[in-house]
């Protein structure tokens, strides 16, 4: 087992793992220990009261955070004709069909989001082995397969996140950067939780959002008192 560095020991000593912090206090604790030489991301882990073994209880969705994530996504759009030109206006980084698919197969292009129009799914379907491991397979439910590629690109560029639960029923995503104002981080967290509640499966009984923890890239998790949100 790797030894804890002095910094990690200090962080762990400064966070009470038995306590759920009021949101403003939680953010203050995060910022206190966000001392890396780069601007750390602020991540969130949400424990859901679901049975992830049941497909109808899995949660996934998409929401645009009010203050973005602090990072601009690189967007690849698969479409043709007028849609191809239109997708460039809101900032699509890569636009194409078979030509783009071949470049991606060869590992020649970097991107964070894939958006195809419905007629392009026949092309994107060939990229399952590349997109699958990265969790980038487009999905109609979260709006990444759409005839309105312009709107989808705008959303992706505006800080849209696409949370989905892991096999343990926990959702991991980002809600901003450590240099965001406290109110911005709070607003983003509230928006995320509202989106998750909206996506709650009808078959889930009891408490849906069981625990919320926030952390920075190099920091420890801080549990948040949901009553303070």
Swiss-Prot record:
GO CC annotations? cytosolic large ribosomal subunit
Q: Does the keyword RNA-binding apply?
A: yes
Question: What is any one GO biological process for this UniProt entry?
Answer: regulation of translation
On whether Glycoprotein is a keyword of this UniProt record, the answer is no
Record GO terms (molecular function): rRNA binding; structural constituent of ribosome; tRNA binding
Q: Specify the superkingdom.
A: Bacteria
Q: Which UniProt keywords apply?
A: Repressor, Ribonucleoprotein, Ribosomal protein, RNA-binding, rRNA-binding, Translation regulation, tRNA-binding
Return the InterPro entries for the record: Ribosom_uL1_bac-type, Ribosomal_uL1, Ribosomal_uL1-like, Ribosomal_uL1/biogenesis, Ribosomal_uL1_3-a/b-sand, Ribosomal_uL1_CS
Q: Name one Pfam family in it.
A: Ribosomal_L1
- NCBIfam families membership: rplA_bact
Protein family according to the UniProt entry: Belongs to the universal ribosomal protein uL1 family.
What task does this protein carry out? Binds directly to 23S rRNA. The L1 stalk is quite mobile in the ribosome, and is involved in E site tRNA release. Protein L1 is also a translational repressor protein, it controls the translation of the L11 operon by binding to its mRNA.
This protein's assembly is summarised as: Part of the 50S ribosomal subunit.
What is the protein name for this chain?
Answer: Large ribosomal subunit protein uL1
This chain's source organism reads: Actinobacillus pleuropneumoniae serotype 3 (strain JL03)
């Amino acid at each position: 087992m790797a030894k804890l560095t002095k910094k990690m020991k200090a962080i762990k000593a400064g966070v009470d793992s038995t306590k759920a912090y009021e949101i403003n206090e939680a953010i203050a604790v995060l910022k206190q220990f966000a001392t890396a030489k780069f601007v750390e991301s602020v991540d969130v882990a949400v424990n859901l009261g679901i049975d992830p073994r049941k497909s109808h209880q899995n949660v996934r969705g998409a929401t645009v955070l009010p203050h973005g994530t602090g990072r601009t996504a690189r967007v690849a759009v698969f479409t043709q004709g007028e849609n191809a030109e239109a997708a460039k206006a809101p900032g699509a980084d890569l636009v194409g069909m078979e030509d783009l698919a071949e470049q991606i197969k060869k590992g020649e292009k970097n991107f964070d989001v894939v958006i195809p129009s419905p007629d392009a799914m026949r092309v994107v379907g060939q990229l399952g082995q590349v997109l699958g491991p990265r969790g980038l397979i487009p999905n109609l439910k979260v709006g990444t397969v759409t005839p309105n590629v312009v709107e989808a690109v705008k959303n992706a560029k505006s800080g849209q996140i696409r949370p989905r639960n892991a096999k343990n029923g926990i959702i991991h995503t980002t809600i901003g950067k450590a240099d965001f104002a406290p109110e911005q981080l709070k607003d983003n967290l509230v928006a995320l939780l509202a989106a998750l509640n909206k996506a709650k499966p009808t078959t889930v009984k009891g408490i849906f959002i069981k625990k919320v923890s926030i952390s920075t890239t190099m920091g420890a998790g801080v549990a948040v008192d949901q009553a303070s949100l």
